[in-house]
Regions:
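Membrane-embedded alpha-helical bundles of multi-pass integral membrane proteins
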Residues: 1-219, 267, 280, 284-318
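Cysteine-centered iron-sulfur cluster-binding motifs in ferredoxin-type domains/subunits
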Residues: 73-88, 180-195, 227-274
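Hydrophobic alpha-helical transmembrane segments in integral membrane proteins
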Residues: 322-346
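Short, solvent-exposed loop/turn segments enriched in Ser/Thr/Gly
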Residues: 353-358, 399, 413-418
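Short solvent-exposed strand-capping/beta-turn motif centered on an Asx-Ser/Thr pair
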Residues: 363-368, 425
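Short acidic, flexible loop segments centered on an aromatic residue
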Residues: 367-381
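Intrinsically disordered, low-complexity Pro/Gly/Ser/Thr-rich segments with frequent PxxP/GP/PP motifs
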Residues: 383-409
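Terminal connector regions
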Residues: 406-441
């Protein structure tokens, strides 16, 4: 299929795959630029290092993704499905390989119906070998987001990969090979939950792929010299090409169906037929239900697209996105946890002071080693008696034992709130953590 929508679909195929296959090979300093290190419980995203305590940012990203999906669906239906969904992307790639090896649809049908021969065997095996190679490469790249990909490549060629790495490479490869090579539209029609609930986000002003029945009916074949209406026929020549090119095999002339992924392939092929017949394009096109009923112009359609529902979705999406970005910009590049030593509530030292013991963890999320200064306040005479400066390696965490005391008898018995202040030397960044100081009654 050739046309404007096929062109944009392939643009997105190329862009998404350049990002997917290329991103793990980029380096940021001495490490991989994007790495989800589950073993060390750290996510590296260029200059950003995230820990389990930063789960709120992942939640925010998921909320943004969901809101974007709602917005795109309300504006133009299953835009994601038709142009950027991995199932669509890899099905397009596998179909392209199939066409290059076996020929167009007619040639593939003839090959399937032909008796067994060396040519048939070679073409089938050649196609599947390319599919399998691409699938394994895809699985390898996927695992490369969780294991440093350069180390993974060395282990792969030296056959030293761990059993779990091998499992996930071939599991993802098998899923790619099966879904894109064989299941294809069955995934969209029966397995994908989005197909079932996406209609709840549609309304009569949502852009969808439509068939202009008033112009196209009654349909029927005719010669190229026949004029529209001359044979009491509409513009549709009943060539069924729109059905043949549809990834899910539906007939758009029967109206919108939940299987439609909004890819526009039927619109492209119909425009090609209209050009050959000398008819106006747009028998199958992106439009809205209200536009079809009221014969709106493109300007009226675009004006109606910015309806209140879309404006609300957009404002919420922008607000959440800005909130997440502001939160990330204000995020301190280190985190602190203070835990009281449960083995001893308090004790009197040889110097006649009352001491409490704490365990303090400092997580340095920066890309360079950092020294931190510790201080405590909240009670008269309260001071730290252990080292007050701690150095932590880049992207590492360190536990230390911290002791604090007050002069004996200077504070009444009970549990007193105190605050530990941890400052990164050479910067204005600091963290304050609350705790308690126990004084026996």
């Amino acid at each position: 299929v050739e046309g404007i929508f096929a062109y944009w679909r392939w643009i997105l195929v190329v862009l998404t795959q350049l990002v997917f296959y290329g991103l793990p090979w980029f380096e940021w300093g001495t490490r991989q630029a994007v790495l989800f290190d589950l073993a060390s419980r750290r996510f590296y995203i260029f200059g950003l290092v995230l820990y389990p305590q930063d789960f709120i940012y992942l939640t925010g990203l998921l909320v943004i993704s969901a809101l974007a999906l709602f917005l795109f669906t309300a504006v133009a239906g299953r835009l994601w499905c038709g142009y950027a969904c991995p199932q669509t992307v890899y099905s397009e790639i596998f179909l392209w390989i199939e066409r290059k090896v076996e020929g167009d649809r007619s040639a593939r049908m003839r090959l399937d119906d032909a008796d067994f021969s060396l040519e048939k065997l070679v073409k089938k095996w050649y196609k599947h070998i390319i599919w399998i190679f691409l699938s394994i490469w895809t699985g390898f790249t996927f695992v490369g987001y969780f294991t440093p990909i350069r180390e993974l490549a060395m282990e792969f060629f030296l056959t030293q990969m761990s059993s779990w790495e091998l499992f996930w490479v071939f599991f993802y490869a098998f899923a790619t090979y099966g879904n894109a090579g064989f299941m294809r539209e069955q995934v969209c029609k029966y397995m994908c939950p989005y197909a079932r609930f996406q209609s709840a986000m549609f309304d009569n002003d949502t852009l969808i792929v439509t068939y202009d029945a008033e112009r196209g009916e009654p349909r029927g074949p005719r010669s190229k010299k026949a004029e529209v209406g001359g044979l009491n026929l509409g513009a549709c020549v009943d060539c069924t090409l729109c059905v043949q090119v549809c990834p899910t095999g539906i007939d758009i002339r029967d109206g919108l169906q939940y299987e439609c992924i909004g890819c526009g392939a039927c619109a492209d092929v119909c425009d090609t037929v209209m050009d050959k017949m000398g008819y106006a394009r747009g028998l199958v096109r992106y439009s809205t239900q209200n536009a079809m009923d009221n014969k709106w112009t493109p300007a009226q359609i675009w004006q109606r697209l910015m309806r209140p529902r879309i404006q609300i979705y957009t404002m919420i999406l922008v607000a959440v996105t800005v909130g997440l970005l502001v939160s990330l910009s204000l995020r301190t590049p280190f985190k602190v946890d203070v835990v009281r030593d449960r083995s001893t509530l308090s004790r009197i030292t040889e110097y006649g002071t009352l001491e409490n013991v704490y365990r303090l963890q400092i997580m340095n999320a920066a890309e360079n080693a950092q020294t931190y200064r510790l201080s405590v306040k909240g009670l008269p005479g309260l001071k730290i008696t252990t080292d007050t400066e701690v150095m932590v390696d880049p992207a590492q965490a360190r536990w230390i034992v911290l002791r604090a005391d007050v002069p004996y008898g200077s504070v009444e018995g009970g549990s007193h709130k105190i605050m530990f202040e941890i400052q990164a030397l050479g910067t204005d960044e600091f963290v304050v953590e609350k705790s308690v100081f126990i004084v026996p009654r």
